Amino acid sequence: MEHRAFKWPQPLAGNKPRIWYVGDYNPDQWPEEVWDEDVALMQQAGVNLVSVAIFSWAKLEPEEGVYDFDWLDRVIDKLGKAGIAVDLASGTASPPMWMTQAHPEILWVDYRGDVCQPGARQHWRATSPVFLDYALNLCRKMAEHYKDNPYVVSWHVSNEYGCHNRFDYSEDAERAFQKWCEKKYGTIDAVNDAWGTAFWAQRMNNFSEIIPPRFIGDGNFMNPGKLLDWKRFSSDALLDFYKAERDALLEIAPKPQTTNFMVSAGCTVLDYDKWGHDVDFVSNDHYFSPGEAHFDEMAYAACLTDGIARKNPWFLMEHSTSAVNWRPTNYRLEPGELVRDSLAHLAMGADAICYFQWRQSKAGAEKWHSAMVPHAGPDSQIFRDVCELGADLNKLADEGLLSTKLVKSKVAVVFDYESQWATEHTATPTQEVRHWTEPLDWFRALADNGLTADVVPVRGPWDEYEAVVLPSLAILSEQTTRRVREYVANGGKLFVTYYTGLVDDRDHVWLGGYPGSIRDVVGVRVEEFAPMGTDAPGTMDHLDLDNGTVAHDFADVITSVADTAHVVASFKADKWTGFDGAPAITVNDFGDGKAAYVGARLGREGLAKSLPALLEELGIETSAEDDRGEVVRVERADETGENHFVFLFNRTHDVAVVDVEGEPLVASLAQVNESEHTAAIQPNGVLVVKL
């Protein structure tokens, strides 16, 4: 799959390259007399780019065929003359009320047949030819009007596709799904084979009999092959819509373009890796997860975004200065986290740090969502932090950070959107296992052992790493299977977990015992699964291992171990369970490489405790013992080595003391002792040095 050529928004004429800094700006929500104050405050904060007109369709086209760009012209002119570039939105994120009144057929339909009414956002369906015509018309009008504007440096196409309209079960979608299946499979017999329709008398005679996976009754089970393809189709339908908008803009005004993804550990709405091939530069919206996993999940998501971008620079298009508005409890950021979180994304490869939004709304559904200028105004800690961050970003740019990229790790944790979709089905061995949790646990456990891993999509170049983790990768296609086998045979070091290689890319089980097509690579054969839980008293709710760890939720029944393999850890259990002394963790020699197999869900803590022995078995070196796990070290460097930056993040609630090598550039909640070449990094603190 080919990537579009990478294109990055360039600075305004006469300006030098900077780390792009600010985010969504919604001047149409405020009286015009506020605009001049906004621009002055932006200059004070070091802002150099804003995204404008994302949800402005009703103001850009107040009546059908009547366009008003005058207000937007004035905004862009004020910004540009102040040295602030514009990432201009297509304006098509949500249709105006006049359109939905005239054309209710553009509204998406849920699986029970209920129509999504206007009143919020993103109530349009991706397969509506009517809505597509309106959207493309606005794109062309925007492109024509702003094609020669010197202050517009990039296109922001729509917004967070699929956030609310991921699935549409309308008649438009039904016809599009039929065409998608015909293109993918060619014949209806091939569809029947792929979906296993011989089961439950679901065989179809022609493509017109294909329908979306609508409501089938409470407690029933949808055909899993069909459901997996439906998720693929839904992602592709939105992708096709985006590409149509993109092409309409670029045909007239060929500026760098993007659309904002929603990459996080648990957000798998679309196949963002596939989408990443069709943008000029990757951009992402990330909102922190409150609690003890806050930093680790954020770092993981940033690493995955970097993997989707194939280590090209990427935009952090949205994150928050503090609380969001859409959780049951909207926790604020702790002191220091505004700066630390932004620098974490920067460390992981982002060359743009942007927020939702510039000025906190005084009305509307997101009025309680934090912003760079909060309700309290510029005399606030949030705005002071915003200004501090702006100065830090300018300093790092002056020191040459923009010439660097995230330094490649020795370990790649593989992530697969389709494996997550497959594990979401309601008829699986257990509902407690989902693909997305295991990569995050491995990322955290590796960090506990001094290794900051890269997170690489399954289509990505993971086989170029010294070591690779396949964490509950339920789907192993024939192509991926070949890559795995070649990787280990040629000397690769592989970690494989339970729930990996169960099915192929049609969701058909690999027969002969698990893990399917790579049993000989890992050197074990699993005959059966042993899910665990607390809902049936008298059954197993956990399993102890003889290395001091505990398995929960899931374990493999490993019935044979190859002569080329040896057991690293075994289960300790009552005789009645059949698990006492059974293999739990093994290492196998395969070709010139080694493959470790972890046959149970150990969680972050169990993995962290098991990894030292496994890392030693596979010959993978880790960091010094004295700071293991307390501090995350991330490096950015250029190809020449002239510019090399080290970011040190305290991921604990205690002060972390580290040795300092190089020149300290940014110290947020960190005190540097220059005479002793050490630094004390406070909780939520970060230190950036240049080697």
Curated annotation (Swiss-Prot):
Q: Which residues cross the membrane?
A: none
Catalytic function, reaction form: Hydrolysis of terminal non-reducing beta-D-galactose residues in beta-D-galactosides
Q: Which UniProt keywords apply?
A: Glycosidase, Hydrolase
Enzyme Commission code = 3.2.1.23
Q: Name one GO molecular function term.
A: beta-galactosidase activity
Q: Which cysteines are joined by disulfide bonds?
A: none
Q: Tell me which family the UniProt entry assigns to this protein.
A: Belongs to the glycosyl hydrolase 42 family.
Supply the name of the protein: Beta-galactosidase III
Q: Which organism is it from?
A: Bifidobacterium longum subsp. infantis
Give the source lineage, highest ranks first.
Answer: Bacteria, Bacillati, Actinomycetota, Actinomycetes, Bifidobacteriales
Q: Which gene encodes it?
A: beta-galIII
